[in-house]
């Protein structure tokens, strides 16, 4: 079996990507889920013009399967799949993006493909000492198997695969004193990472979850009642929410639902003083759901206090506390902003300083100021409570300006 070399500067570049581009190992799951989501997007997009594809939107999904015995973690999708040529082109050339090629070839800004740079797949090597990819393109007779242990290169062979889609099989590293790699085989850990980074990916992310049930043994006690025993039952469970509340139409979401979502995500049982729902389209498109809290949940101002706005790109969490979005005097504002137009750096971990983010921030601040002016005019007691809680922030802002 011939060993192929990566087409970029091999070992040095791969080491750079694994050890420098990504600063947080756990994001490997976000990257692989994003790739799987892209594959499902592509198959769905093709199915709109090719009825022979024979799959509906409801059929597409992503499956996560840990196996402690074999120490593997498998991410499976039933998306478009890849041919041998596409596999070598996309995985054999570091920093090449098949998703970007697909979007360019189809010349549509309406295709919400997450991947841009083609390096996310290689984040798997941060937690794996070997990665195996088994894939089959829709319409192809045979599947293809790609395998690599890292910078030494990779092998590509034909294989049998019944259905279109892709399996990414990670052979998880052994634990060290510094890192418990085996934690990435724990159901609770994987569910937490999906919830944190990929909860709003549009396709179902499914895991086989085991829970206990009481079932009859077939015997009866002396009173004629069935004797029960506890059994473990494993069943597929969707572990992501898929459609975020801010992406749903205003007519589908009540103010009470927004308030409950705020309370749950911010662990604040006080109703927010104001809710802002924003849907902007134009040069920069974005959706935002912002809240002015009913009390100071940071307990005062502090230079170390985190900002309250989370930033998403196409439903994937990019930054938990985006301090580049709003001025410090609005750090009490909570909520989310989701935009497909953000310019990210190569690892998607850090935003590049760009005009889009500045435009979004300026527009949001105008909306917040307008809401506060409306509150001051229409509900003076509520505004006075707001001022008591956050007036010092606004005063600091006046001084800074």
Where are these regions (language model features)?
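GHKL/Bergerat-fold ATPase module in large chromosome/replication-associated machines
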Residues: 113, 131-153, 173-401
